[in-house]
Amino acid sequence: MQAIKCVVVGDGAVGKTCLLISYTTNAFPGEYIPTVFDNYSANVMVDSKPVNLGLWDTAGQEDYDRLRPLSYPQTDVFLICFSLVSPASYENVHANWYPKVRHHCPSTPIILLGTKLDLRDDKETIEKLKEKKLAPITYPQGLALAKEIDSVKYLECSALTQRGLKTVFDEAIRAVLCPQPTRPQKRACSLL
């Protein structure tokens, strides 16, 4: 069985842990507890191939900036996450997460993921954003950012409703099993 290491990064509170818990246990966690580091594992079949998917949850908070890269070596694929209802987390993909990931892992495939899809059409959430003269991130905006950072895919999901959830991890596995031909074959990560 092939083992694939997937590291999940993004701002604090964008839903990285909920994403992983919902996917691996089919249950949505009730309370928010900021992560330092956690690992999850799932044995899955993708395109008739058995895969052991190692999922590495990381801390989004700045306090862990020096610790986080310790989880990067030998990463096969990154999920860079932002919340569809947090424009600041969307901006931080380009300003923070993408440059950091690329610095440590220049050729590892990236999937850009918009989380909290269930809240994009939520009236209360939209109103709160409007009060701050903000709006949820649209699918075309996500797609544009994915192109900018040269991610292999742009996906959106909801850990709460599980809409699009399985697709995220299937596509992460496919990014490793069926790499895009323009990318170099060497995918190992190294710390400098």
Curated annotation (Swiss-Prot):
One of its GO biological process terms is: small GTPase-mediated signal transduction
Q: Which residues form the propeptide?
A: 190-192
User: Per its Swiss-Prot or TrEMBL record, what regulates the activity?
Assistant: Regulated by guanine nucleotide exchange factors (GEFs) which promote the exchange of bound GDP for free GTP, GTPase activating proteins (GAPs) which increase the GTP hydrolysis activity, and GDP dissociation inhibitors which inhibit the dissociation of the nucleotide from the GTPase.
Show the coiled coil region(s). Answer: none
| Major place of residence | cytoplasm
Q: How does it sit in the membrane?
A: Lipid-anchor
GO CC field: cytoplasm; membrane
The species is Cavia porcellus (Guinea pig)
What's this chain's function?
Plasma membrane-associated small GTPase which cycles between an active GTP-bound and inactive GDP-bound state. In its active state, binds to a variety of effector proteins to regulate cellular responses, such as secretory processes, phagocytose of apoptotic cells and epithelial cell polarization. Regulatory subunit of the phagocyte NADPH oxidase complex that mediates the transfer of electrons from cytosolic NADPH to O2 to produce the superoxide anion (O2(-)).
Subcellular location per the Swiss-Prot or TrEMBL entry? Cytoplasm; Membrane
Print the organism lineage: Eukaryota, Metazoa, Chordata, Craniata, Vertebrata
- EC code(s) of this entry: 3.6.5.2
How would you summarize the oligomeric state and partners of this protein?
Answer: Interacts with DOCK2, which may activate it. Interacts with S100A8 and calprotectin (S100A8/9). Found in a complex with SH3RF1, MAP3K7/TAK1, MAP2K7/MKK7, MAPK8IP1/JIP1, MAPK8/JNK1 and MAPK9/JNK2. Interacts with PAK1. Component of the phagocyte NADPH oxidase complex composed of an obligatory core heterodimer formed by the membrane proteins CYBA and CYBB and the cytosolic regulatory subunits NCF1/p47-phox, NCF2/p67-phox, NCF4/p40-phox and the small GTPase RAC1 or RAC2.
**Catalytic activity, per the record?**
GTP + H2O = GDP + phosphate + H(+)
Membership in a protein family: Belongs to the small GTPase superfamily. Rho family.
| Key word GTP-binding present | yes
One Pfam family matching this protein? Ras
Q: Identify the residue span(s) of motif Effector region.
A: 32-40
UniProtKB keywords: Acetylation, Cytoplasm, GTP-binding, Hydrolase, Lipoprotein, Membrane, Methylation, Nucleotide-binding, Prenylation
Give the residue numbers of the S-geranylgeranyl cysteine lipid attachment. Answer: 189
The protein in question is named Ras-related C3 botulinum toxin substrate 2
